[in-house]
């Protein structure tokens, strides 16, 4: 039977999804299932790994059945996933010894402080590209080994396996035959040397993690094994894998140095490809691994904003200023400007490039003439200002001035926000026709690995742009508006 499709498994923080793409990179079928969020203690976040697998395997069956697609027609399955989330399971039984500790979980803060006391902060920064933070997998692994009865003894005997979610899914898909990850996910563990592209023995020793626990690291664009859908039909190749933000970067075909994408979700994730050069940031950004045009290792600068779409949720849920997120475009467009109002949405502190956990949200410039429309417009503009903060930091670190910014995520449907983003950054903003770029990136990697597509050049003909947003304000206005934002941020941090 002719191979007509590639399936992307998109395992996210709140739901598991499966998306079928045809040879023209069109979406044919989508299936999605949410799963349980567990909060056993303040600041702790967990998932049940078996529920993740159940939700992901069921949507894989559903997505094909819904479109009447036979498994024989599927060329490959690609994987993209929430990064950093940590699973440890028994090699013999495949049974997790503890719930998955989610990237948001802060329980290993004390372990991070111990590593800082040992003087490892600079070593971590230099060799992994990351900050010493509980966000990343390394300290989560140590917490499980230290706190689950008998776990450390089992690990020392080589009876346990660790994986981020990509590794866990491949293990389950291949029925325990393959224990593997890719460089983009390995680079988020805080255990991976991004220069030698190997596990870092000094960090493993510092955290007392046996090497036998860790998966083999294979290229993001390669075949890892085979699977059968629900144990039936012919074998399908499991091929192509990347963490969610790197998958989106590849899905946007940002495969050359200086190309960048911004994902507008709950927060914002801005990544810039820096090619074969790992650029160290002096402005609060992370240095991480990306995927090059032939599936090889490239590097990227990454910055994250905590409050993107979440700011709009606040307008809706806490202030009651809007009924739906899409209302913001209408209200923001009813006024010519914010009337001097700035919202700094530092509800949980400020992310890159400030990294100020003590900052708190504030509205500035309120006068008797300020109304609902001005506040809504200021909220939308705050997302663009924060993204400009990241973009300026990337320009300083990389020495590359961006000319075009590719965008994806839920908020890109808002034309007002996209136009203001172009205006305030003086950069052309490109919105793709297919905004499912994370899943598309996984599909591209899988399809390239098995020859479903020949090259990135072929893919460029399939990646259509829905709309170009051209900068439309003068330099003087841009400087004045951004100076107002910088002043508001400074006051928030005072």
UniProtKB/Swiss-Prot annotation:
Pathway: Polyol metabolism; glycerol degradation via glycerol kinase pathway; sn-glycerol 3-phosphate from glycerol: step 1/1
Residues at which glycerol binds: 83-84, 135, 244-245
E.C. numbers: 2.7.1.30
UniProt KW Transferase keyword: yes
GO BP, one annotated term: glycerol-3-phosphate metabolic process
Presence of the UniProt keyword Translocase in the record: no
GO MF annotations, alphabetized: ATP binding; glycerol kinase activity
Positions bound to ADP: 13, 17, 266, 309, 410, 414
Alphabetical list of InterPro entries matching this protein: ATPase_NBD (IPR043129), Carb_kinase_FGGY (IPR000577), Carb_kinase_FGGY_CS (IPR018483), FGGY_C (IPR018485), FGGY_N (IPR018484), Glycerol_kin (IPR005999)
Family assignment from sequence similarity: Belongs to the FGGY kinase family.
Primary role: Key enzyme in the regulation of glycerol uptake and metabolism. Catalyzes the phosphorylation of glycerol to yield sn-glycerol 3-phosphate.
Protein name per Swiss-Prot or TrEMBL: Glycerol kinase
Organism of derivation: Shewanella baltica (strain OS185)
